């Protein structure tokens, strides 16, 4: 089966490589041509446009930064996709957006599968992300081999729109955990504890989290380099708070966390790494959160 892949950012490039290594034919495009340079040696075909990818592949996967870009790319690829093709959307969208996009695709005879992912760039590199899927059962079955080339767990959440809800929930939790980890580490530092030892103690405790193990380590290194921007965090928190209003659920922690990210964007810019919210505390208290022995970037070996 031949898949097209559009969007070769922090996640997409790894996903395309893993699909090719699993034996799929893969054609790719990114608005930044240099993003595809490293993929050529893997036998991946680089196309000159998104529409060329659609004309070449049996099915098209997109992994893009926001719904506006997803819609623009979708409008470009649909006229060149086969009527029996599937569009697999791995970007994080709101539920209403993905339902609307699915309807637009259906007008061209193209079916939609949403498959946002969670786990982080270091897991994408080794094909161990968690795939959160929404769509028809037969489409999930058809594309499970490709999905399992990119991840090691698939959760079929229900119809189109359901995966968007759970993806936003998981990201909301991650951002809340990141704020909590930043505050916990600062408490440890100001309390006179060795930060490295404190990190390990938290990791072994009931207060541990995936975010503490991963992004907490990058805070202690000082790189903050998780490959996920403050702008993307604010986008996803906006989706979460929108769901809260729609479903009548007060989201006090998410609201407070959003304000922290707003402050971090004002201080460091929207392209800054999301763990840089810890810098707000560091600068406020004139106290850094550095400790020896923590990685600059996450890999499967260094995470946790």
Where are these regions (language model features)?
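Rossmann-fold dinucleotide-binding core
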Residues: 8, 93-171, 175
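Hydrophobic beta-strand scaffold residues
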Residues: 26, 46, 112-113, 154, ...
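Residues in the short beta-alpha loop(s) of Rossmann-like NAD(P)-binding domains
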Residues: 31-32, 66, 136
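Helical "substrate-binding/catalytic lid" subdomain
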Residues: 142, 162-284
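Rossmann-fold NAD(P) dinucleotide-binding segment
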Residues: 50-111
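NAD(P)+-binding Rossmann beta1-loop-alpha1 motif at the extreme N-terminus of oxidoreductases
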Residues: 1-62, 84-85
């Amino acid at each position: 089966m031949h898949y097209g892949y559009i969007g070769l950012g922090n996640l997409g490039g790894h996903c395309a490589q893993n699909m090719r290594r699993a034996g799929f034919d893969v054609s790719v495009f990114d608005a930044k041509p240099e993003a595809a340079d490293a993929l050529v040696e893997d036998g991946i075909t680089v196309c000159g446009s998104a529409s060329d990818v659609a004309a070449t592949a049996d099915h098209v996967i997109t992994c893009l930064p926001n719904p506006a870009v997803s819609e623009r790319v979708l409008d470009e690829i649909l006229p060149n996709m086969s009527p029996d093709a599937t569009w697999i959307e791995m970007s994080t969208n709101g539920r209403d957006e993905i339902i609307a996009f699915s309807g637009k695709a259906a007008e061209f005879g193209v079916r939609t599968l949403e498959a946002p992912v969670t786990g982080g760039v270091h897991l994408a590199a080794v094909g161990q992300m968690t795939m959160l899927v929404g769509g028809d059962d037969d489409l999930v079955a058809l594309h499970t081999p490709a999905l399992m080339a990119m991840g090691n767990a698939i959760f079929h959440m229900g119809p189109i729109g359901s995966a968007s809800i759970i993806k936003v929930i998981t990201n909301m939790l991650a951002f809340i955990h990141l704020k909590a980890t930043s505050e916990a580490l600062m408490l440890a530092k100001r309390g006179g504890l060795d930060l490295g030892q404190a990190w390990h103690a938290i990791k072994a405790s009931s207060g541990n989290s995936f975010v503490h193990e991963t992004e907490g380590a990058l805070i202690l290194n000082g790189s903050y380099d998780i490959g996920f921007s403050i702008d993307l965090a604010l986008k996803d928190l906006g989706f979460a708070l929108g769901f809260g209003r729609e479903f009548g659920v007060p989201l006090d922690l998410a609201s407070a966390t959003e304000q922290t990210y707003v402050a971090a964007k004002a201080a460091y810019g929207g392209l800054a790494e999301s763990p840089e919210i810890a810098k707000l505390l560091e600068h406020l208290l004139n106290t850094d959160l550095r400790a020896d022995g923590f990685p600059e970037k996450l890999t499967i070996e260094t995470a946790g």
